[in-house]
Curated annotation (Swiss-Prot):
UniProt entry tagged with the keyword Membrane: yes
SUPFAM superfamilies from the UniProt entry: Immunoglobulin
Region spans: Complementarity-determining-3: 111-117
Name of the encoding gene: IGKV1-6
Region (Complementarity-determining-1): 46-56
Protein name: Immunoglobulin kappa variable 1-6
Superkingdom of source: Eukaryota
GO BP annotation list: adaptive immune response; immune response
Region (Complementarity-determining-2): 72-78
Signal peptide start-end: 1-22
UniProt xrefs under SMART domains: IG (SM00409), IGv (SM00406)
Chain positions covered by the region annotation Framework-3: 79-110
Protein role: V region of the variable domain of immunoglobulin light chains that participates in the antigen recognition. Immunoglobulins, also known as antibodies, are membrane-bound or secreted glycoproteins produced by B lymphocytes. In the recognition phase of humoral immunity, the membrane-bound immunoglobulins serve as receptors which, upon binding of a specific antigen, trigger the clonal expansion and differentiation of B lymphocytes into immunoglobulins-secreting plasma cells.
Length: 117
C-alpha cells in the first residue's frame, strides 16, 4: 500500500482521512519530549473512534522519506530493530523504544488506515 504523507508532519499530529466510516482524528502525545541515549521512550496515539489494529508507526528524519516501523499496531516491519515495539487496539496505541540509540533521534508519528480512502 502506498502510504504517502506530507514531509512537514511534526510534533503533535491531528490526522484525519475522509472515508465511508466518518473522519477519524488521531491525537498523539507527547507533542515533544527530551530523552537521552539509553532511555526508554513511550509515545501514545489515541483514535477518536475504534480502528481495530489498523495503525502504523513511522519514523522521519529531516530530508528523508518516512520509514514504516510498526504495522497492524504491533507487527515489526522487516529490518527494524527489536528495540521498537508497538501495542494497543481499538482507540489507544503505544510505540515504545526500549533503549534509545543515537540514530533514533527523529520525528515519530502514527497513521491509521482503518478508513484509508
Amino acid at each position: 500500500m502506498d502510504m504517502r504523507v506530507p514531509a512537514q508532519l511534526l510534533g503533535l499530529l491531528l490526522l484525519w482521512l475522509p472515508g465511508a466510516r466518518c473522519a477519524i482524528q488521531m491525537t498523539q502525545s507527547p507533542s515533544s519530549l527530551s530523552a537521552s541515549v539509553g532511555d526508554r521512550v513511550t509515545i501514545t496515539c489515541r483514535a477518536s473512534q475504534g480502528i481495530r489494529n489498523d495503525l502504523g508507526w513511522y519514523q522521519q528524519k529531516p530530508g528523508k522519506a518516512p520509514k514504516l516501523l510498526i504495522y497492524a499496531a504491533s507487527s515489526l516491519q522487516s529490518g527494524v530493530p527489536s528495540r521498537f515495539s508497538g501495542s494497543g487496539s481499538g482507540t489507544d496505541f503505544t510505540l515504545t523504544i526500549s533503549s534509545l540509540q543515537p540514530e533514533d533521534f527523529a520525528t515519530y508519528y502514527c497513521l491509521q488506515d482503518y478508513n484509508y480512502p
